[in-house]
Amino acid sequence: MTIELRDVSYTYAGKYQRVTAVDTVSYTFQSGTMYSIMGASGSGKSTLLSLLAGLKLPTEGEIAFDEQPTRFMDRSALRRDTVSVIYQDFNLFPLLTAEENVCYPLRLRKEDKDQALALARQRLADMGIRESYFRKLPNQLSGGEQQRVAIARALAAGSYVILADEPTGNLDSGNSRMIVETLQRLAHQEKRCVIVVTHDPAVAAAADVQLRMQDGRLTQEEQQEEA
């Protein structure tokens, strides 16, 4: 999976004038790689993530998934089949159990109920969630467990692209480390394209490619050195 941004800009109406949140960004993201994006509040990070998720369309330029521009795609299908977003607040359905939350994208695709449940349970186990927790509601789980359920849902969906918005923001150091290691595994072993927006330098440093948003522009790329 290749995601190409071609002179992408996004503007919106401010109180007194139009505001440019993303300014003429050109970049190519590849599968098998973990990227981090840092930047100050208001630098355009979250807007860029929304553009990549198909939640917004560029005001100028285009974003293409394997050469197919998003403006010509069914963006609901894009989010259902290609892109998963992991949020800082987990974004789990409060009245669904852990396994039901993981099953949700599979049920949207009308996959066989028993097969969907089996896959959901396998992905929860892959994330270190004990079987006795599969039927717990989100408010019965710790923050780290809820984030692992959210990642299990992205895994079960089979998404090629994982967008993570401050995925460790509410977690302690131990859970943060586990989440980062999981994202690395998704990129390196399962060949997903993983893009992480973070304010944590340690999380950013764990990425293969480190990027920075400043005044709507994507800058300061650093490639990790091979050991």
Regions found by a protein language model. Give the residues of each.
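ABC ATPase NBD coupling module
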Residues: 70-84
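Short coil-to-helix segment of the ABC ATPase nucleotide-binding domain corresponding to the Q-loop/switch region
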Residues: 96-103
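Conserved ABC ATPase signature
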Residues: 137-141, 145
